[in-house]
Each structure stands twice: as C-alpha cells, then as structure tokens.
A protein has these predicted regions:
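Positively charged n-region of N-terminal signal peptides that target proteins for export
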Residues: 1-3, 17-18
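Short, low-complexity N-terminal intrinsically disordered segments enriched in polar/charged residues
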Residues: 16-53, 57
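Mature soluble domains of exported/periplasmic/lumenal proteins and thiol-rich metal-chelating peptides
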Residues: 49, 54, 65-66, 132, ...
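A solvent-exposed, acidic/Ser-Thr-rich amphipathic alpha-helical stretch
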Residues: 53, 57, 61-110, 114-116
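Solvent-exposed loop/turn segments at secondary-structure junctions
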Residues: 70-72, 124-127, 156-160
Length: 171
C-alpha cells in the first residue's frame, strides 16, 4: 500500500510542475497594462474632446493606424491629418465608451526587438449632432520604449460608420 501511495503522490506532484514546453513558443508574456491603459485613456480623452494636438503628442513619429478595411495610415503626420478629418465629422470619438472595456498587456519579441502592446475589447461610440453609432471594438495598441503610441490596429464592423459618411475618410 505504501509503495502505491508513494507512486501516486509522486505522479501527482510531478504532474503539477510547469514544464518549459508550456511557455509561449513565440516568447510572448502578459505584463501589467496599467501604464499603457493610462496612455490609451489619455489619447482617447484627447480625441473625445477634439484636442488633436494633445493626441498627436502621444504618437511616435513613425506611428500608424490599421483599419479593418485594409487601409494603413503610416506616419505621424498622416495619422494626425486623418484624426483632424474624422474629428470634423464626429464631435464624440470615444473608443472606450463601454464600462466593460477589457484590457490585456502583452510583451514579446527577440532580444533587441522587444515590443509591448495593449489589447482592448469594448464598445466605441462615434456621435455628432444628428447621429450616434456604437460598435463593438477590438484594438491592439503597440507602444514604443518611450511609451509613445507606435501603431494602432482597430478591428470593428465599419458598416454603420461608412453609411454615416458622405465620403468615407478611411479609404
């Protein structure tokens, strides 16, 4: 009986150990997202109040924005121009309008090429005097070593937004 009990306990203990093979093969790991959330929230607040200059101060010179229709806007100047244009259409641009926005901080990459990103899921609201559109919104925001926004990838259904435009500003 003692031998069987010893064997069972040994297997139970060994099966609880974390093996190196359970690590992410791409080297990604979760990190505390607090600082990235603060930056993303400040960026969102700047957009929501129409303070494009403040939003621009949080962007890296090589910043970019990817949209679900395949459009990539590259370079800080191009992103700022897009924000100015969209801000003419919407008086409210709130990319975390839902109280249930979920965040996840992730880091990874090879030595010397590390990256960190904030993943967020929630609702985005775009509104003006005549219309309000709220869509489920998924976003990945990459940050530079200087905690500037390096790139944003937004994933959402653009159908209602495009229907609101006379001319789609993101094409």
């Amino acid at each position: 009986k003692k031998i069987f009990l010893t064997l069972i306990l040994s297997f139970a203990i060994l099966s609880c150990e974390t093996t190196t093979s359970s690590a992410d093969p791409d080297g990604r790991s979760l990190i505390d997202p607090t600082e990235m959330i603060e930056i993303a929230t400040a960026f969102n607040n700047a957009l929501n109040t129409g303070d494009i200059e403040m939003a621009a101060s949080m962007l890296d010179e090589d910043a970019g924005w990817s949209f679900p229709n395949g459009v990539n806007v590259e370079g800080k100047e191009a992103v700022v121009a897009l924000l100015e244009n969209v801000n003419q259409i919407w008086t409210t641009i709130d990319q975390s309008s839902g109280e249930d926005t979920a965040y996840l901080g992730v880091t990874g990459g090879d030595e010397g090429e590390e990256w960190k990103a904030l993943l967020s899921w929630g609702e985005a609201t775009y509104a003006n005097d005549s219309k309000s559109v709220t869509v489920p919104y998924h976003q990945v925001t990459w940050f530079t070593d200087d905690n500037l926004i390096g790139w944003i990838s937004g994933l959402y259904d653009r159908t209602e937004l495009v229907a609101s435009y006379d001319d789609d500003p993101i094409k």
